[in-house]
Structures are given as structure tokens and as C-alpha cells.
Amino acid sequence: GRKLDAREIANLMLELEDRGCHNINLVTPEHVVPQVIEALAEAIARGLASPVVYNTSAYDALDSLRSLDGLVDIYMPDFKFWERATARRLAKAKDYPERAREAIREMHRQVGDLRFGPDGLARRGLLVRHLVMPGQTAEAEAIFQWLADEISPDTFLNVMAQYRPEHQVGRDRRYEEVARRPTAAEIDEAYAAARRAGLWRFAR
């Protein structure tokens, strides 16, 4: 990597747009929100028109999200864990579930449900991702029910099946319960749980 100032980042955004990129995707930007805001303001002032995607773990500070209101078009958060104990054990962040709920509420307040243009590309709204983990069907079900009840039954959901045990998880018996890939049955059950909750818009 290399250090860039706000103008240089804005230049890159505009260059990507000129090359035909469909959006400007900011991946895991939670720790550099002030710099993101400065760069976006510069790029928009210079004509940036592509949708801005905020791609996040959902472990975001509310103040940071509120400062992005009007700058971000598409929020793409993960919702990883429902239980504090699971978040503490696997992510060392026991407050993740409530932080994610607060963050996703704020994201939806700003941009609403995901909407598409005539070209079939997403233009504005919320897209929530959930990574299916082995043995965590009940947590997935709780997440989906909350999304349907508290955010919107029209929430666009990406149920992701690509979990792989790596690094310590793959070698250390402390994480034995997640030291395997989810089964096809677990993935199917995640989709079924989402449908039972009332969700119906899925990324495939």
C-alpha cells in the first residue's frame, strides 16, 4: 500500500468511474471515516456520479455513520453473530451484536431498501450479508427474524456459504466447533430460516 491524501483518493475514484466501474466500493473503511468523507466530498464536487458502496463488518460507531449521511448510496454490512458469547469467543468483541443492530438501523434510515436501476445494477439501499457458520443455525434464524421485523421484510440478503476454517481455527482445538465448513444442509436451512422470517430478496 501507499499513503494518499484526500485529493489523490478522489482522483482514483474519478479514474475508476472513467474506466467504467459500476460503483466506488469502500472496503472495511470504519477506521478511516474522516479521510473517506474528505475524499468523497472532493470527488463529488468534481463530478463523481457512481454509487458509493460502504462495505463493512457493521462494527461501526453511530457518529461515524451519521457523518456519512448523504455521501453513501449503498450500505453493505455483515451481520455475523447474534449472541454476545459467540461474538466474544470468535471475534473478541462481545458488544458486536448490539453494535451491528444499531449500525444497520442507521444505515437503513439513511438509504432504505435496496433499489435497482433500469440496467439491473444496484443504485441505492441496504444489502445485508450473513456468513453461514457451522452449528450456528439458531443465530442465523435470530438475525433474519430481526431483519424482517425491525428493519424491513424487503431487506436484500446475501447468504454466504464460503466459510473456511483457516489460521488458528484450522489447527487449534479451542475452536473445534467451527473447524469445518458448513454443510449443504446448513446452508439450505439458512435460506429456509430467512424465508420463514419473511425475507424474500436474496443475492445468488
Spans of model-derived segments:
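Non-cysteine beta-strand/loop elements that form the S-adenosyl-L-methionine
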Residues: D69-R84, F156-Y163
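Conserved Radical SAM active-site core
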Residues: G1-I74, R84
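Anionic-ligand binding region
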Residues: A87-D119
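Active-site beta-loop-alpha junctions enriched in small/polar residues
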Residues: P29-H31, S57-Y59, K80, L131-M133, ...
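Short glycine-enriched, charge-decorated loop/helix-capping segments at active-site entrances
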Residues: R2-K3, R89-K94, D172-R181
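Auxiliary Fe-S-binding modules of radical SAM enzymes
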Residues: G112-R204
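Short, conserved beta-strand edge motifs with alternating hydrophobic and charged residues
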Residues: V53-N55, M76-F79, A100, L127-L131, ...
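Alpha-helix-loop-beta-strand connector modules within alpha/beta enzyme cores
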Residues: A39-V53, R99-Q110, P182-A193
